[in-house]
């Protein structure tokens, strides 16, 4: 079996070139190695390490950091907090629910519309629609046998009975679960643990699959975002943004910060910015129905001089100049069509186009963003989500949302068959939790260099955790002591890991929780095993 480096080095070469590195010299050697059938995997590993160590060329015209502090420092001036009101009218609980329910419904409708033609270019979509006598498109896509895979029949016109399973919806649910678990104290590690606990590996793709693979090798955020991951600027983080905007109405900065935490487990640079941009737009859509203001809120949370910001500004300008979305699509294609079909930048431009034309016409918004091609289900879902907030569930066209029958299927463990209204209600319940911000850190710091001994009560029975010796012991079963393989304390958050020898293979356990004075609370992963502890010795 070929090494992973051999399989992905061409994608990494393109990524490094796009992020501003001078790859001319190493590209020659990489292509020669690819052409050499006898080239050893060790050579590809060496080339890959050299390639990913290249610095950004000083002539690169953009500033694109990947830490939250650096991103914040490079943002343009913008309004980051709004009163929870639209047009001067406070958003009461009923209105908030209508907006959030509209967001979930709109996201599902846009996703279902784009799902059957995911990855198709605009020309192929239009050719299909002409053959189906479905232009102009004013409903879901008809099914044409032998041209549309049978797997997409549940998302085709006259065949929709629910929102079929799609990763664009799976990740919205995963984000909801992570927020229900940790609230505003959500961390990259807690999200990673949620993926492992709830999401099958085979149901994630590109950057998410690379990150998930890294988790299984104990490569955790933020390193998981870059290690052997040439897809780190693809759209995968952007499609995970929505839930973080839903829970932060009127708070684009808070939404973007939550989105950063999520994005940082699998993405870098513009991959991160895409999720922050969308989350901030969603937060603003609760407050204003003006496309320019929604888009400005998104731009306000990402570096002013990054490639994504340039593409957004270009697209907004073209939309303001043109009444025909297809003319704007042509300009987007000419300027940004060189990016991969599922890259963040080109697809974000289509989202901006869909939001601009859709703020007064839900159907036009999702139809234009899907007919434009590229990552159609992702873009339709994001545009539908934003417009669902703008219009609210009650005002969404029945032909687009009624056929879903308030039902959403997912691959998320324990959440496979959902009532969309229930998901919306669970989301609303988090809004005030998120508005309060992270919990106050405990008054007493743990003396970490002498972390002491702790008696734990867990779903696996009593254990003794000793930071002095760096071990954990299962008291009733005579298992251990096992050495801690990693530990980290950032008041009040505590993480530690250990491995259980299973007769020749190691079963890795990860603890995630917090300490308040002499009390420890958290969970063991995998399995979400409750852990309660009390310090017994200093």
Region locations from a protein language model:
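An N-terminal structural lobe/cap that precedes and organizes the functional/catalytic core
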Residues: 73-109, 113-170
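C-terminal domain-closing interface element
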Residues: 153-168, 179, 420-449
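Extracytoplasmic mature domains of secreted/periplasmic and thylakoid-lumen proteins
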Residues: 183-235
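Long, charge-dense tracts
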Residues: 1-45, 49-59
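Accessory "access/gating" subregions that flank catalytic or transport cores
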Residues: 76-93, 212-235, 241-255, 259-373
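Aromatic-rich carbohydrate-recognition surfaces in CAZymes
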Residues: 155-191, 195-204
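Catalytic phosphate/nucleotide-handling subdomain of diverse soluble enzymes
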Residues: 109-115, 120-136, 267-270, 277-279, ...
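Central antiparallel beta-sheet cores of small beta-barrel/beta-sandwich binding domains
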Residues: 448-515, 524-537
């Amino acid at each position: 079996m070929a090494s992973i480096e051999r399989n992905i080095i061409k994608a990494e070469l393109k990524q490094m070139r796009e992020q501003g590195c001078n790859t001319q010299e190493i590209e020659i050697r990489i292509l020669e190695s690819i052409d050499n059938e006898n080239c050893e995997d060790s050579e590809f590993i060496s080339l890959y390490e050299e390639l990913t160590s290249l610095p950004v060329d000083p002539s690169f015209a953009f500033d694109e950091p990947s830490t939250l502090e650096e991103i914040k420092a490079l943002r343009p001036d913008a309004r980051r907090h709004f009163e929870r009101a639209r047009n001067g009218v406070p958003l009461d609980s009923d209105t908030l629910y209508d907006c959030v329910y509209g967001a979930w419904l709109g996201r599902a409708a846009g996703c279902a519309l784009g799902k059957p033609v995911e990855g198709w270019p605009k020309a192929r979509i239009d050719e299909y629609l002409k053959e189906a006598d479905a232009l102009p498109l004013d409903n879901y896509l008809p099914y044409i046998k032998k041209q549309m895979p049978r797997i997409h029949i549940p998302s085709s016109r006259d065949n929709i009975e629910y929102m079929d399973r799609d990763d664009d919806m799976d990740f919205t649910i995963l984000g909801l679960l992570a927020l229900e678990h940790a609230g505003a104290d959500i961390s990259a590690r807690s999200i990673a643990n949620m993926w492992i606990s709830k999401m099958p590996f085979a149901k994630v793709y590109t950057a998410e699959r690379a990150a998930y693979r890294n988790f299984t090798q104990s490569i955790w955020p933020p390193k998981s975002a870059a290690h052997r991951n040439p897809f780190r600027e693809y759209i995968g983080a952007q499609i995970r943004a929505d839930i973080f905007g839903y829970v932060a109405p009127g708070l684009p900065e808070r939404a973007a910060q939550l989105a950063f935490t999520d994005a940082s487990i699998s993405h870098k640079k513009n991959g991160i910015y895409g999720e922050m941009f969308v989350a901030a737009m969603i937060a603003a859509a609760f407050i204003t129905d003006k496309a320019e203001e929604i888009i400005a809120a998104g731009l306000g949370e990402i570096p002013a001089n990054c490639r994504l910001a340039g593409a957004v500004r270009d697209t907004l300008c073209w939309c303001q100049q043109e009444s025909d979305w297809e003319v704007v699509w042509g300009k987007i294609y000419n300027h940004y069509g060189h990016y991969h079909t599922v890259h963040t930048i080109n697809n974000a431009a289509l989202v901006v186009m869909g939001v601009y034309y859709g703020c007064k016409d839900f159907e036009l918004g999702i139809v234009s963003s899907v007919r434009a091609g590229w990552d159609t289900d992702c873009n339709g879902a994001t545009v539908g989500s934003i417009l669902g907030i703008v219009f609210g569930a009650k005002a969404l066209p029945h032909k687009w949302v009624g056929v879903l029958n308030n039902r959403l299927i997912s691959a998320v463990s324990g959440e496979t068959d959902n009532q969309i209204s229930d998901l919306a209600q669970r989301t609303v319940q988090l809004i005030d939790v998120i508005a309060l911000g992270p919990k106050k850190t405990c008054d007493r710091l743990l003396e970490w260099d002498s972390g002491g001994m702790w008696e734990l009560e867990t779903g696996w029975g009593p254990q003794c955790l000793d930071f002095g010796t760096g071990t954990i012991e299962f008291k009733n079963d005579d298992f251990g002591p096992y050495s801690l393989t990693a530990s980290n304390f950032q008041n009040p958050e505590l993480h530690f890991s250990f491995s259980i020898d299973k007769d020749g293979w190691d079963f890795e356990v990860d603890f995630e929780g917090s300490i308040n004075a002499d009390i420890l609370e958290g969970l063991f992963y995998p399995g979400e095993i409750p852990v309660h502890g009390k310090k017994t010795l200093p």
